[in-house]
Amino acid sequence: MPKFSTDWFTHNQKDFDMCLNQAKPIERYLEIGCFEGRSACHVIQKHLTSTGHIVCIDNFYGGQEHDSVDFNQVYETFLENIREVLNGSMRTYEVIGTTSHQALTMLNARDEEGFDAIYIDGSHTARDVLMDSIMSWPLLKQGGVMIWDDYLWDDVEGVYNQPKLGIDAFLDVFQDRIEIIHNGYQVGIKKR
């Protein structure tokens, strides 16, 4: 049974699942910001095909809201959790332990075959969320789903330190290429 010290996911799980169900089958899944792997484990157990592949990007340093967190322990817990839910399956995973900007540059350069679903839950600053979104867009397959977490998050003061402004900017610029499938604490879109 995977171990988690926090639960920032379960309260959004119904909306998350509804969005991912529109991307089925999910053979390839990309997650930006994975912490201890709660959402990644959920995707592996409930949404990823039996031979699916998951890519998780996280620098395991956290943001200003994580000053007191031991990220060496977070990384070890993440690996233990992912390995446990993958145990005995044909599914595969890759962890890219660097900034999302570096990792997404690398994934775009590798000429990836694309992802059926992308979950953006890394840095919470508007600029980083916008960059993650734009850099992920070419990696999302036609008909694929992109989900952002923490759209309404305001634990840190200043709109530039919150995801909403970055998500709104992306939605405005790409409005003719997307269908919004959910808009709440999480936002989900489908690529046309």
Positions of PLM-derived features:
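S-adenosylmethionine/decaboxylated-SAM
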Residues: 2-192
